[in-house]
């Protein structure tokens, strides 16, 4: 039984390094989705040039508060869009100026959040690479123990259990990474949708 377990673990360890990164330009990028380091403004905003709004949006506390609220992914997109529409529909407001300030804030905030998520994914990849090497070396050590005469059964059992635990953690992380790989695209889509809501109000 333990020999079969060792064989399975060795097979897993041998395949780990090949599946950590799909793009040779970004060796720590673990996702099947292509890595796009930054959101292009033109891809998410078809409105007027933002100009000074890119620097000035933080000067207005109300803009900053709405940016924080609308950017948060825990807030349903429809609620974020409604908050933006309500904000830009207030009497006497300069929709064009306010809309540009608001989008400039959303663009900066969500781009920063996206970069943080991507950096986190690459940190996990580096940890996974180290974990893969540990699994590989421990598997080889387990095979050596099993081949020894006489076998050290307590040590075999200890190392075998350790390997099962290490592999379980590795697989759990891999499942989490697969889920988190969707987040940058989700952020892109949210930013585009919020930008459209602003544009519809200022057109």
Regions found by a protein language model. Give the residues of each.
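Positively charged n-region of N-terminal signal peptides that target proteins for export
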Residues: 1-5
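Bacterial N-terminal signal peptides
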Residues: 6-15
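N-terminal Sec/ER secretory leader and immediately downstream segment
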Residues: 21-96
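Short, charge-rich amphipathic alpha-helices with coiled-coil/heptad character
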Residues: 89-118
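Non-transmembrane amphipathic alpha-helical segments
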Residues: 117, 124, 128-146
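Short E/K-rich amphipathic alpha-helical oligomerization segments
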Residues: 137-165
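Alpha-helical oligomerization segments
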Residues: 154-203
């Amino acid at each position: 039984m333990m020999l079969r377990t060792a064989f399975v673990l060795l097979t897993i360890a041998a395949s780990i390094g090949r599946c950590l990164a799909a793009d040779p330009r970004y060796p720590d990028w673990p996702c099947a989705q292509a890595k796009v380091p930054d959101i292009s403004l033109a891809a998410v905003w078809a409105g007027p040039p933002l100009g000074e709004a890119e620097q000035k949006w933080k000067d207005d506390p109300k803009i900053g508060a709405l940016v924080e609220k609308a950017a948060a992914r825990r807030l349903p997109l429809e609620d974020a869009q409604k908050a933006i529409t309500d904000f830009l529909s207030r009497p006497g407001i300069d929709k064009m100026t306010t809309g540009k300030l608001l989008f400039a804030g959303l663009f900066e905030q969500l781009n920063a959040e996206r970069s943080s998520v991507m950096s986190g994914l690459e940190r996990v990849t580096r940890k996974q690479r180290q974990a893969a090497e540990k699994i590989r070396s421990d598997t080889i050590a387990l095979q050596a123990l099993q081949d020894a005469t006489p076998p050290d059964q307590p040590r075999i059992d200890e190392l075998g259990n350790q390997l099962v635990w290490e592999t379980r953690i590795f697989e759990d992380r891999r499942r989490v990474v697969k889920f988190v790989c969707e987040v940058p695209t989700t952020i892109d889509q949210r930013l585009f949708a919020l930008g459209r809501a602003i544009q519809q109000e200022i057109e």
